[in-house]
Amino acid sequence: SDPDRPVTQGGTDPTKGMKTDYQKKFNYLDIIGFNGNGEEIGELEHFHKNYPTLCAIATEVPHTYQTRGVYRSQTQWRRRDFPAPWEKGNINWEQFKHRVFPIPDLTEKECFPEESDYPYYQSSYDNASVRISARKSWQRTCSFPWLMGEFRWGSFDYLGEAEWPQRCGNFGIIDIAAIPKDAYFLYQSLWTDKPMVHLLPHWTHPGKEGKTIPVVIYTNCDAVELFINNVSLGSKPYTGEQLIWLVPYSPGKIEARGIKKGKIVATDCYQSAEAPHSVALASNKYSVKAGSDEVIRIEIDITDKNGIPCPYASNELSFHVSGPLRLLGVDNGNPTDMFPYQQPHCRCFRGKCVVLLQSDEEKGKGTLTVQGTKLVEKKLIIEVI
């Protein structure tokens, strides 16, 4: 044992073994860590009832899924709808469903039936999970003074623990290309004091005119007012949960305005996109020292002729690097793409991809040129100093 620091562990059911050998286990563990089973209804309460003097931490909680840019209005449970390899044939959903926290469907009928063509992608409405939503998990963590916190699984998407044709699962709140998913902004609304509003989904839904789309907002403001094409759909007070509007789709602009003490303090908006026309390049830095190990990260969006991002675009892009720069890798965040990271081309996923560069030993101007079929070519200059 370590006399200087509290000792913990992550366990599927850490109370097993304590029931008959409590004192021995307590000699080694100061804080009891709960993995997946800690997400189930009544599990943590049962622990606290039996061991009221011990504190706990959720070491692998919650397990929720999202694929960036993908939405489904009806709830999906992993064990029922997309079982992991080790669950296939081993789990009877009817016997398991009473142990999960309910996540109501957002609509009676699926708003995005076309997404059924992509069974390895999960919805970004916080309605694809193993046992509990991210929202409910945090509410529960906050309500138990003897529960120190939670470490969600996972923070980033990661290679492995997935079945062909996937290279990674969809556990993260940031995808494998380091692009935030919607859940990232849920946690931001819970943990930051800076006023913020996040709106989902995007507002490019061709063929769905007049059909009801669930619009979800995360915020830390007092209230949010929603607008479609500058017409107010009303405001709703924030009470610690997500805000939901059911909105008949009409192309144009959707905007959420966060209000504190009667003033607009944060906004978020989307504009309906037309056909892909060009690319937009955004770099984390525009100058770098020669021979540096710094990484230049360039996020690329497919845009229409008005510069509006195209959220369904899947154009193939090619990258040419000249001057004192070299290509480190490319990625698009798609969990089912198996391309080599070092190749100088990439198919965008849900309108985006990322290019990573690094400087050579020489000084001068380096250039990244991005090209795509029927797209306007773009160049980005990086000063190597």
Language-model features and meaning:
Residues S1-P237, I244-Y249, K253-K263:
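Extended substrate-binding grooves/exosites of carbohydrate-active enzymes
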Residues H205-G210, S287-I296:
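Short, solvent-exposed loop/linker segments at the N-terminal edge
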Residues V215-T219, R257, D293-P311, L317, ...:
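Beta-strand-rich structural segments
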Residues I244-Y249, Y341-E361:
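Short, hydrophobic beta-strand segments
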Residues Y249-K253, V295, K363-K365:
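Extracellular Ig-like/FN3 beta-sandwich strand-entry sites
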Residues K263-E274, V376-V384:
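Edge beta-strands of extracellular beta-sandwich domains
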Residues A273-G291:
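Low-complexity, acidic Ser/Thr/Pro/Gly-rich terminal tails and inter-domain linkers that flank the onset
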Residues H277-L281, F319-T336:
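Short aromatic-acidic-glycine turn motif
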